[in-house]
Curated annotation (Swiss-Prot):
Belongs to the class-II aminoacyl-tRNA synthetase family. Type 1 subfamily. It holds the Pfam family tRNA_anti-codon. It comes from Shewanella pealeana (strain ATCC 700345 / ANG-SQ1). GO terms for molecular function: aspartate-tRNA ligase activity; ATP binding; nucleic acid binding. The gene is aspS. Homodimer. Its EC number is 6.1.1.12. It is found in: Cytoplasm. NCBIfam families: aspS_bact, PRK00476.1. This is Aspartate--tRNA ligase. GO terms for biological process: aspartyl-tRNA aminoacylation. Keywords: Aminoacyl-tRNA synthetase, ATP-binding, Cytoplasm, Ligase, Nucleotide-binding, Protein biosynthesis.
């Protein structure tokens, strides 16, 4: 039905007759000539109909937005004065010779103009229309190019594309599982996989030493701009490769993607330890485009007569750190109060500040509500430590170390945006040497990555003796403050795996019930293995500049995990529930506060 895509027509086709199909993006009658913008997934081309062909002209005059049509015409060059540099096809136009309406369109429920706002609900309800918009179509086409490039790279490096089960067993991986009731085994449930983690390890044990899969994963968790209940991973696992080798190979893949698809040379990725990232940036996924860093000043303020500072400064678990913001002294008191309110979201109790209005005036040039607690020597030491100049602003975080890191790390990002401090377009890095475990709110231990991550150079006995001091052989790839992917060397010894389970409070009986198949498999010559999983949706979001992963997925869910297009989730009918042995129990209404007094 067509000879070319609309967006592919160019000057090399001048003088040729082409057949195109697509949708009417816009139609207008200017001085007795009909100009038609015809759109398909590759772009838009202008078609011109004039009255010299009255039958075709009359049909063209009836066209409206989103009519699906076929046109035949002659490619001709536009006059220089009419060239549109904003269009790929802007040097040419089609003189329409024939026109067939393949289907008309009802009045549109959403606005197709990119400059007009549609609600998220409208866009998802009429996603098939939303996806016709060029910016959305471009992202979906770009996504296909990324997955194609990934497959070419991995296939070319000896990786095998192997599918793993979607109906599997629930395992504790951090988020809630989506459960699927079994009709055959009443009262029992499959779980949709949060990742193929255990199956890809089993593939290593099976001798398939290089595996990959572009795979759907499912997590029933609260959603954010970069989270969806179902998402796609580029899942990779290897045997007989060290963590350094896995990092080198996957870095090569990502650098190749950016070079091929964006013509961007990312260069060699620097490496940074988890401890350094948290100390300098308050985050284990630092955005290195932002020049601001957290600067420790506990040693300077530990003797001041101000409990907000000297308390954390003298607490082994406390921290006092500052941000020095160039030009920040211009902020009003109201704006500073907004910053103080912002850090409370992250657990901070408040935010002290110091304006350097005029460095030459000494203490007279310093403005701060806590200045009365600070001697001139302390102020001078702070100025020297931070390198603050006239017009700068110093912001203080003082609390438990984890709260200071989280609150000041978040404030660092906000200030970087507010003051337009971001430098460069792409800043990748590897974050390595993560703690194996972290404390939970109830004092227990939680695996920072997952319970199958191997420690660096420790025996099971050493690990159980000092779990909180253990460093994992794990690595995260970070770009512009987003985690692109994370991985680790895996445990390949049953004794070490059992030790990790015990540290996490999983006794031998529970471990046998939930992971017995893994512990058994580890007994039969399991090779050393390591891997990594990338969030494909997040990679596409960054590469296309989209604001949400919903804008790079064909049919995403809302932030409440619903699909307005199909009205999913929906109720099952009683017959289906009976076959599954499932009954629906109405949730009990929450007790009124007065009823509990």
């Amino acid at each position: 039905m067509r000879s070319h895509y609309c967006g592919d027509v160019n000057k090399s086709h001048v003088g040729q007759e082409v057949t195109l199909v697509g949708w009417v993006n816009r139609s207008r009658d200017l001085g007795g000539v009909v100009f038609l913008d015809l759109r398909d997934r590759e772009g838009i081309v202008q078609v011109v109909y004039d009255p010299d062909l009255p039958e075709v002209f009359d049909v063209a005059s009836t066209l409206r937005s989103e009519f699906c049509v076929q046109i035949k015409g002659l490619v001709r060059a536009r006059p220089d004065s009419q060239i549109n540099a904003d269009m790929r096809t802007g040097e040419v136009e089609i003189l329409g010779l024939e026109l067939t309406i393949l289907n008309s369109s009802a009045p549109l429920p959403i606005n197709m103009d990119k400059n007009q706002h549609n609600t998220e609900e409208q866009r998802l309800k009429y996603r098939y229309l939303d996806l016709r918009r060029p910016e959305m179509a471009d992202r979906i086409v770009f996504r296909s190019k990324v997955t194609s490039a990934v497959r070419r790279f991995l296939d070319g490096n000896g990786f095998l594309d192997i599918e793993t089960p979607i109906l599997t067993k629930a395992t504790p991986e951090g988020a809630r599982d989506y459960l699927v009731p079994s009709r055959t085994y009443k009262g029992q449930f499959f779980a949709l996989p949060q990742s193929p983690q255990l199956f890809k390890q089993l593939l290593m044990m099976s001798g398939f030493d290089r595996y990959y899969q572009i795979v759907k994963c499912f997590r029933d968790e609260d959603l954010r701009a970069d989270r969806q209940p179902e998402f796609t991973q580029i899942d990779i696992e290897t045997s007989f490769m060290t963590s350094a080798q896995v990092m080198d190979k996957t870095e090569e893949m990502v650098r190749g993607l950016f070079k091929e698809l964006l013509n961007v040379d990312l260069g060699e990725f620097p490496k940074m330890t988890f401890e350094e990232a948290m100390r300098r940036f308050g985050s284990d996924k630092p955005d290195l485009r932002n020049p601001l860093e957290l600067i420790d000043v506990a040693d300077i303020v530990k003797e001041v007569e101000f409990a907000v500072f000297n308390g954390p400064a003298n607490d082994p678990e406390g921290r006092v750190a500052v941000l020095s913001i160039p030009g920040g002294a211009k902020l009003s008191r109201k704006q500073l109060d907004e910053y103080a309110k912002y850090v409370t979201i992250y657990g901070a109790k408040g935010l002290a500040w110091m304006k350097v209005n005029d460095l030459a005036q000494g203490m007279e040039g310093i403005q701060s509500p806590v200045l009365k607690f600070l001697s001139e020597d302390v102020v001078n030491a702070l100025l020297e430590r931070t390198g603050a100049q006239t017009g700068d602003l110093i912001l203080f975080g003082a609390d438990k170390a984890n709260i200071v890191a989280e609150a000041m790390g978040a404030l660092r990002l906000k200030a970087g945006e507010d003051f337009d401090l971001l430098q460069g377009e792409w800043k990748p890095l590897w974050v390595v040497d993560f703690p194996m475990f972290e404390r939970t709110s109830d004092g227990g231990l939680h695996a920072m990555h997952h319970p199958f991550t191997a420690p660096s150079n420790m025996t099971p006995e050493e690990l159980e003796a000092n779990p909180i001091g253990a460093i994992s052989d794990a690595y995260d790839m970070v770009l512009n403050g987003c985690e692109l992917g994370g991985g680790s060397v895996r445990i390949h010894d049953s004794k070490m795996q059992s030790a990790v389970f015990r540290i996490l409070g999983i006794n031998d009986e529970e471990a046998s019930e939930k992971f017995g198949f893994l512990l058994e498999a580890l007994r039969y010559g399991t090779p050393p293995h390591a891997g990594l999983a990338f969030g494909l949706d997040r990679i596409i979001m960054l590469m296309t500049g989209a604001s949400s992963i919903r804008d790079v997925m064909a049919f995403p869910k809302t932030t409440t995990a619903a699909c307005p297009l199909t009205n999913a989730p929906g109720f099952a009918n009683p017959v289906q529930l009976a076959e599954l042995g499932v009954s629906v129990v109405e949730a009990e209404p929450k007790a009124d506060a007065k009823d509990t007094e």
